[in-house]
């Protein structure tokens, strides 16, 4: 049976649903979802010999909801995932799985912390590679 925990990741407290033991697998939901979108995968991942951890990203569900817009950068959210891994799997690399908006979150986390990530998967979103320039510039052009 999964366990609900609030994990202090350093910059925010995240609500996590955790089941199993073994290498850490963190599941990151999309927009506008929550840990609940992973409810069918948690048990299967745990039964396969992993610690399955589905989170509410900061600003969602039971996790902290900072008021300042600046608190929602990809860097801050990636730091949450690394902080979570430091608590649940200290010194061991984690597997990250992201769906929808969770995909760029896990990709960014892997790009910026390659030594902390064992594997990464993005679901339902095509991988376009590392950004060559800020997305805001691209948006202004169109």
Regions found by a protein language model. Give the residues of each.
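N-terminal cap/lid segment of alpha/beta-hydrolase-fold proteins
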Residues: 1-13
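Residue-level marker of motif borders
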Residues: 6, 24-25, 95
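Flexible "cap/lid" subdomain of the alpha/beta-hydrolase fold that forms the substrate-access gate
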Residues: 12-14, 38, 53, 60-97, ...
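Pocket-edge positions in alpha/beta enzyme catalytic cores
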Residues: 6-8, 30, 69, 73
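Residue-level preference for short coil/turn positions at secondary-structure junctions
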Residues: 10, 20-21, 48, 90-92
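Conserved HGGG/HGGXW glycine-rich cap/lid loop of the alpha/beta-hydrolase fold
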Residues: 15-64
